Amino acid sequence: MKHVPSISISKDSLSNKNILITGAGSGIGRAVAKIAAKNKANLILLSKDIKKLYSLQDEICDEGGNDPLIVEFDFLKASEKDYKKLADSLYENYEKLDGLVHVAGVLGYLSPIINTSLNQLKTVMQVNFESNFLLTQLSLPLLLLSLIHISEPTRLNP
């Protein structure tokens, strides 16, 4: 039997925290959104499928969660200008961003490298890497307002 990890969140730890979740329309992104909503987070949900976002928004509101902001956003088709427009909207509507959960991604093509085209590789890199880079980079001023750094001295050599 496959082990399924569980997530334990202390009561009120996400209450009124602003959390942006990509890939929120289905799968892991949707599950993370529902858990965060049950814990009263203020959600910004991104997906390329607006119908799935509307459905999730209804579920969250019906279950007593805060009404999430939903944004149709296709990481495969988005340009830098689209990312900038999204970031500008975040700056206009939020004082800070407490969390950024990158879930949107594509598996890619399961074939030997000899059978993989450059365009197939570019698709995977654009959705799985470039989108995370651009969204994080443009959101950093909002995220830095909520960062906490903890370090523990460690020894590099025994």
Which ranges hold each PLM region?
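Conserved glycine-rich cofactor-binding loop
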Residues: 25-27
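Conserved glycine-rich Rossmann-like NAD(P)H-binding loop of the short-chain dehydrogenase/reductase
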Residues: 41-55
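Rossmann-fold cofactor-recognition segment
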Residues: 63-79
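Substrate-binding pocket helix/loop in short-chain dehydrogenase/reductase
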Residues: 86, 111-113, 117-125
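Conserved NAD(P)H cofactor-binding loop of Rossmann-fold oxidoreductase domains
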Residues: 104-109
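A short, exposed helix-loop element centered on a Lys and neighboring polar residues
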Residues: 136-137
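Single conserved hydrophobic/aromatic residue that forms the stacking wall/gate
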Residues: 148-158
